[in-house]
């Protein structure tokens, strides 16, 4: 993931700042009623995939990719987010900048007391 800084305003004139991520935040929609981690797409993928999730309330959020042995590959997001729908993309690279081997990987969303993990497949 490339480092970046982006600022936007929503229809209410509120500033939204994204730092170090490529993602989209949909703040103007009605707040979700529950936490939801959606299946990444495309899946299988090479080299880019997208992650999306719903947060019903503000909280500290991590979105992390792990290999089949449970080793952390990269952190897609690590910080505070308000309630809403979020979408992030991943270029398929290890945090060191290298491409992981083809195979099964897992991504995990943790937010407040919610934790969910899903499976994905990298192909080359």
Where are these regions (language model features)?
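Short beta-strand edge segments in extracellular beta-sheet folds
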Residues: 120-124
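Proteolytic cleavage junctions
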Residues: 1-36, 42
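Surface-exposed coil/turn segments at beta-strand junctions on protein surfaces, enriched
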Residues: 8-10, 30, 44, 56, ...
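Glycine-centered coil/turn sites that cap beta-strands in beta-rich domains
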Residues: 24-41, 45-67, 75, 87-90, ...
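Surface-exposed loop/turn motifs at beta-strand-loop junctions within extracellular Ig-like
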Residues: 11, 21, 67, 94, ...
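Extracellular and select intracellular beta-sandwich modules with Ser/Thr-enriched
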Residues: 114-118
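Short, surface-exposed loop/turn motifs with a glycine/proline- and acidic-biased composition
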Residues: 77-113
């Amino acid at each position: 993931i490339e480092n970046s800084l982006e600022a936007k305003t929503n229809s209410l004139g509120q500033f939204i700042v994204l730092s170090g991520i490529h993602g989209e935040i949909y703040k103007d929609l009605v707040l979700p009623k529950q936490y939801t981690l959606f299946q990444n797409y495309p899946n299988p993928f090479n080299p880019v995939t997208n992650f999306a999730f719903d947060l019903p309330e503000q909280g500290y959020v991590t979105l992390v990719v792990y290999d089949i042995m449970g080793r952390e590959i990269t952190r897609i997001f690590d910080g505070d987010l308000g309630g809403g729908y979020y979408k992030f993309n991943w270029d398929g690279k290890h945090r060191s900048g290298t491409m992981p081997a083809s195979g099964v990987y897992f991504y995990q969303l943790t937010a407040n007391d919610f934790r969910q993990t899903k499976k994905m497949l990298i192909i080359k």
